[in-house]
Swiss-Prot record:
CDD domains: AAK_NAGK-like. It catalyses: N-acetyl-L-glutamate + ATP = N-acetyl-L-glutamyl 5-phosphate + ADP. The keyword Kinase applies. GO terms for molecular function: acetylglutamate kinase activity; ATP binding. Pathway: Amino-acid biosynthesis; L-arginine biosynthesis; N(2)-acetyl-L-ornithine from L-glutamate: step 2/4. Pfam families: AA_kinase. It comes from Koribacter versatilis (strain Ellin345). Its EC number is 2.7.2.8. One of its GO terms (cellular component) is cytoplasm. The lineage of its organism: Bacteria, Pseudomonadati, Acidobacteriota, Terriglobia, Terriglobales. The keyword Magnesium does not apply. It is found in: Cytoplasm. This is Acetylglutamate kinase. Keywords: Amino-acid biosynthesis, Arginine biosynthesis, ATP-binding, Cytoplasm, Kinase, Nucleotide-binding, Transferase. Coiled coil: none annotated.
Length: 261
């Protein structure tokens, strides 16, 4: 199976969870699955910005990324966090290579059109599927930081959920899994929804039932499913050790999203 895993910045702050996640990635790869990891790192980025005397700025929940913030993101996400995560996967016996979107021409970004200009905030314009296939053929797990270069030569900060969705869509992954700090997608009563089809996803978005960070995540899920990804799962990061069992039985926690129910 082709599996794309996205681990959020909050989970990366927990060393025990990261260790658990890396062991799971190694186990999946050793079982013959092709695994690709995408990560963000917003918490570490904000912390480093403050240490450098740069106050993080947000507009409607989205990070304002001026040139200085973008450069620090390259250092923190594309450097420290990326290499630490790739090394941690390697430490449990699975070869992994740390990349950002510009490495191996993995993907090309473009400035994201938004009502308010947020600076160097981008979206994925194209993906080099052959580069991913080459790494998988050589038994390597790509670990991708959510940054990519545009045709204009500028680096752009990419929403990690959107990057994971774009990469999963490009390689037509069997499953895309988001490991988050929430138990799953909730309905209007606050109860976790176990399984959703595209029609229900669109209804939740249209009726304003989902908000905050879950909104772009569901939009990313929708695009992945529409592009042919087999299924998407939104799971609490604390359940990382149970990932292998998800391919053997129905999902027991979190939310599974499919094209049709």
């Amino acid at each position: 199976m082709k599996i794309v895993l996205k681990i959020g910045g909050a989970a990366l702050e927990n060393k025990d969870l990261v260790g658990q996640f890396c062991t799971t990635v190694a186990s999946l790869a050793k079982d013959g699955h092709h695994v690709l990891v995408v990560h963000g790192g917003g918490a570490a980025l904000s912390r480093t910005l403050k240490e450098l005397g740069i106050e993080p700025k947000f507009l409607n929940g989205l990070r304002v990324t001026d040139a200085r913030t973008r450069d620090v993101a390259l250092m923190v996400l594309g450097g420290l966090l990326n290499k630490q995560l790739a090394a941690a996967i390697g430490a449990v016996g699975q070869p992994a290579i740390g990349l950002c979107g510009s490495d191996l021409h993995l993907c090309v970004a473009r400035k994201k059109p938004l009502a308010e200009d947020l600076g160097f905030v981008g979206e994925i314009a194209s993906v080099n599927e052959e580069a991913i296939a080459h790494l998988w053929a050589n038994n390597a797990v790509p670990v991708v930081a959510s940054l990519a270069q545009g045709a204009d030569g500028e680096f752009y900060n990419i929403n990690a959920d959107e990057m994971a969705s774009a990469l999963a869509a490009a390689c037509i992954a069997d499953t895309l899994i988001f490991l988050t700090d929430v138990p799953g997608v909730k309905d209007a009563n606050g109860d976790v929804l176990n399984r959703l089809g595209l029609d229900r996803i669109e209804s939740l978005i249209a009726n304003g039932i989902v908000s905050g960070g879950m909104l772009p995540k569901l939009e990313a899920c929708k695009r992945a499913l529409q592009a042919g990804v087999g299924s998407v799962r939104i799971l609490p990061a604390t359940k990382a050790e149970a990932l292998p069992s998800l391919f053997e039985s129905p999902i027991a926690f979190g939310t599974e999203l499919v094209a049709t129910v």
